[in-house]
Amino acid sequence: MKKENFKEYTKNFNLKKIHTGSIWTEGPCYLKKFNKVVWSDIPNNRMLSFNFNKVEIFRAPSNFSNGNTIDNHGNLITCEHGARRVTTTDQNGIITLIADEYNEKRLNSPNDVCVHSNGTIFFTDPPYGIINPKRVEGFPGKMMYGGCNVFKHDP
């Protein structure tokens, strides 16, 4: 990323690298209650966090987590390629299932997620985490329905 490309947008551009050593990172989000940023390191099957002092492991294994976001209550919502599900982690660390199937068929490999201001959760479900055994981003599996899909979950 060239600093010159952004000069017209910001006068005090200050980009700092906070971590190296991951293979493929996705889904950074800020956990306000804990004043930290978490993200997924998919092939290493872990989630990392940065508390503005140091980077540490947040969750390992992470079920090859990918996209993350925060719901309207400050809980972490995570797409897990490996478990083929979407979960929420409350502020006490308790993980609860949001979705793992559609029409009684397993999800493919939930990927990205966002939450509407009314609490509705939207997530994508491509097959990437199950169809390519040479790429470590989940566990090989059978697609239960075709295509790349977007789902809506009303709480």
What residue ranges belong to the model's regions?
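Sequence-structural signature of mature extracellular/luminal beta-sheet repeat domains
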Residues: 1-155
